């Protein structure tokens, strides 16, 4: 039995890690940290996991990273905080999955420009943890940068077309997310009266996930692409629906495109290709699946592909556990084999 610590256990990603790890047969959570809630019972703060595993016996702790000695650490801290923690764990030889944006960029200047932070804890061996593209690298690394929620759905929606050089350099992603993507701390943006019965775009051309999507697709296509991304906030709790647009470089049919996607993802349990019907948020709610469908081509050669993920699972904590399973040599599906909550 491998041991786990969760640094930053009061947010939504920490909560989801606890929920999902309660179904994992090969790990036990020993430490959940929180400076603010230190000394309080875990299940008083997270009553949804009461009576699961050893959670009734756990209290939040304020532990310095130097004093953590578990096999795996999930770092569920805000951007900027992880860079002070992860290098210490890295030096101790602990397997770390960081859910912040601090280690997603090989180009540190790009990170500093988009996040407005000076990076003080660079780890050159950190690997971008999108298993469908980087599984072999993940297996060999002890520091994994868990992808962002929007980039996960966006990259997976277009990866087969980019890898096969079937679309031109212009790719547009239109994503709509549930409110939980904004985090556990309430704001005017996420206040119920402002979100309910409403829909709006934000950070229309300058969301920090834009360069993350772009650099991964650039790598996959081995060329510089012109990636545009605009997010919207939906009046729902969970889920991201991404509509991807580009223009085909060749005269291929919808059937050809579907065949390309099925071949590209044939060994990927967590990617489901829908030839017919629409992918939906309810279909992936609570799951680690990315559902991909659409594949429609208009009279101008524009192809539209649609993906759906749960932003807190495949877009965060579920993918983090998937990465843990890979680096620890567990079955990749362990703790994650659950279907969507539909309706």
Swiss-Prot record:
<dbReference type="GO" id="GO:0005737">
    <property type="term" value="C:cytoplasm"/>
</dbReference>
<dbReference type="InterPro" id="IPR050085">
    <property type="entry name" value="NAGSA_dehydrogenase"/>
</dbReference>
<dbReference type="Pfam" id="PF22698">
    <property type="entry name" value="Semialdhyde_dhC_1"/>
</dbReference>
<keyword id="KW-0963">Cytoplasm</keyword>
<comment type="similarity">
    <text>Belongs to the NAGSA dehydrogenase family. Type 1 subfamily.</text>
</comment>
<protein>
    <recommendedName>
        <fullName>N-acetyl-gamma-glutamyl-phosphate reductase</fullName>
        <ecNumber>1.2.1.38</ecNumber>
    </recommendedName>
</protein>
<comment type="function">
    <text>Catalyzes the NADPH-dependent reduction of N-acetyl-5-glutamyl phosphate to yield N-acetyl-L-glutamate 5-semialdehyde.</text>
</comment>
<keyword id="KW-0055">Arginine biosynthesis</keyword>
<comment type="pathway">
    <text>Amino-acid biosynthesis; L-arginine biosynthesis; N(2)-acetyl-L-ornithine from L-glutamate: step 3/4.</text>
</comment>
<dbReference type="GO" id="GO:0006526">
    <property type="term" value="P:L-arginine biosynthetic process"/>
</dbReference>
<dbReference type="InterPro" id="IPR000534">
    <property type="entry name" value="Semialdehyde_DH_NAD-bd"/>
</dbReference>
<dbReference type="GO" id="GO:0070401">
    <property type="term" value="F:NADP+ binding"/>
</dbReference>
<dbReference type="Pfam" id="PF01118">
    <property type="entry name" value="Semialdhyde_dh"/>
</dbReference>
<dbReference type="GO" id="GO:0051287">
    <property type="term" value="F:NAD binding"/>
</dbReference>
<dbReference type="InterPro" id="IPR000706">
    <property type="entry name" value="AGPR_type-1"/>
</dbReference>
<dbReference type="GO" id="GO:0003942">
    <property type="term" value="F:N-acetyl-gamma-glutamyl-phosphate reductase activity"/>
</dbReference>
<keyword id="KW-0560">Oxidoreductase</keyword>
<feature type="active site">
    <location>
        <position position="149"/>
    </location>
</feature>
<dbReference type="InterPro" id="IPR036291">
    <property type="entry name" value="NAD(P)-bd_dom_sf"/>
</dbReference>
<dbReference type="InterPro" id="IPR023013">
    <property type="entry name" value="AGPR_AS"/>
</dbReference>
<keyword id="KW-0521">NADP</keyword>
<keyword id="KW-0028">Amino-acid biosynthesis</keyword>
């Amino acid at each position: 039995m491998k041991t786990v610590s969760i640094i930053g256990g009061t947010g939504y990603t920490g909560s989801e890690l606890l929920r999902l790890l309660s179904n994992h047969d090969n790990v036990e959570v020993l430490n959940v940290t929180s400076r603010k809630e230190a000394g309080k019972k875990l299940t008083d703060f997270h009553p949804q996991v009461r009576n699961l595993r050893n959670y009734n016996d756990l209290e939040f702790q304020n532990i310095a990273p130097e004093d953590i000695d578990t096999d795996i650490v999930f770092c569920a801290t805000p951007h900027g905080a992880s860079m002070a923690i992860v290098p210490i764990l890295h030096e101790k030889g602990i397997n770390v999955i960081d859910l912040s944006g601090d280690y997603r960029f090989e180009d540190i200047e790009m990170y500093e420009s988009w996040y407005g932070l000076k990076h003080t804890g660079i780890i050159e061996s950190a690997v971008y943890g999108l298993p469908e593209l980087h599984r072999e690298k993940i297996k060999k690394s002890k520091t994994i940068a868990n992808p962002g929620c929007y980039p996960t759905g966006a990259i997976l929606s277009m990866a087969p077309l980019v890898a096969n050089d079937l679309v031109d350099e212009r790719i547009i992603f239109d994503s709509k997310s549930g409110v939980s993507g904004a985090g556990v701390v309430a704001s005017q943006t996420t206040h119920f009266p402002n979100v309910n019965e409403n829909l709006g775009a934000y950070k229309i051309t300058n969301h920090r996930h834009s360069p993350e999507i772009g650099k991964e697709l650039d790598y996959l296509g081995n060329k510089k692409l012109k990636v545009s991304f605009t997010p919207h906030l939906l009046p729902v709790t969970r889920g991201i629906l991404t509509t991807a647009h580009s223009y085909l470089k060749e005269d291929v049919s919808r059937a050809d495109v579907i065949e390309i996607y099925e071949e590209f993802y044939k060994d990927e349990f967590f990617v489901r290709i829908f030839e017919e019907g629409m992918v939906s948020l309810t279909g992936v709610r609570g799951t680690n699946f990315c559902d991909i469908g659409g594949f429609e081509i208009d009279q101008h050669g524009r192809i539209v592909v649609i993906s759906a993920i749960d932003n807190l699972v495949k877009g965060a904590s579920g993918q983090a556990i998937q990465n843990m399973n890979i680096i620890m040599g567990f079955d990749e599906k362990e703790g994650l084999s659950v279907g969507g909550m539909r309706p």
